[in-house]
Amino acid sequence: MVHSIDIHPSRKHICVVGGSSGTVFAWDLRQPQEPIPISVLGLNETAEPVCESEVWEVLFDTYTKSSDIISSASARILPVMMCSEDGILAVVEQDKRPLELLAESCAINSFDIDPQNPSDVVCALEWESVGVLTRGRDAMSEE
């Protein structure tokens, strides 16, 4: 089941979706029969979903640096930020280990990345509270 969808900021034929059981997939709408798994590592690594519950929201994350984007821009998917029912806010990237930004004891129902200052993220938590996260550049360049 799909809970959230986001369209790539510059390649409008690429979208990313968040759904059940921790799944995050990207689709090239020109080839819709071949989804690209984002939330687990590739076949040469152990499958490692960042969460096991519903993914409530996904957004392309232009703030996180990807080591592979420059070398193969046409083939790579931008990193994706996601939040889940089990309280995880993380950045997932194709064939990379997830980068967990926040782990709460309640669901993170929604979030938004400030377009003017993309290091700032605001989260809506299940307990009717708001979380504000400011990301440092050093933490975002993890290999």
What are these regions (language model features)?
Residues 36-48, 97-102:
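A short beta-strand motif characteristic of beta-propeller blades
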Residues 11-16, 65-81, 98-99, 118-122:
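Structural hallmark of WD40 beta-propellers
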Residues 1-27, 31-34:
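Beta-propeller domains
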Residues 32-34, 96-97, 138-140:
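Short coil/turn linkers that define WD40 beta-propeller blade boundaries
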Residues 18-21, 83-86, 124-127:
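Conserved strand-to-loop turn within each blade of WD40 beta-propeller repeats
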Residues 1-8, 50-72, 106-113:
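Canonical WD40 repeat/beta-propeller blade segments in eukaryotic WD-repeat proteins
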Residues 24-28, 89-94, 130-135:
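WD40-repeat beta-propellers
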Residues 109-143:
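Blade-level signature of beta-propeller repeat domains, shared across WD40, Kelch, NHL, RCC1
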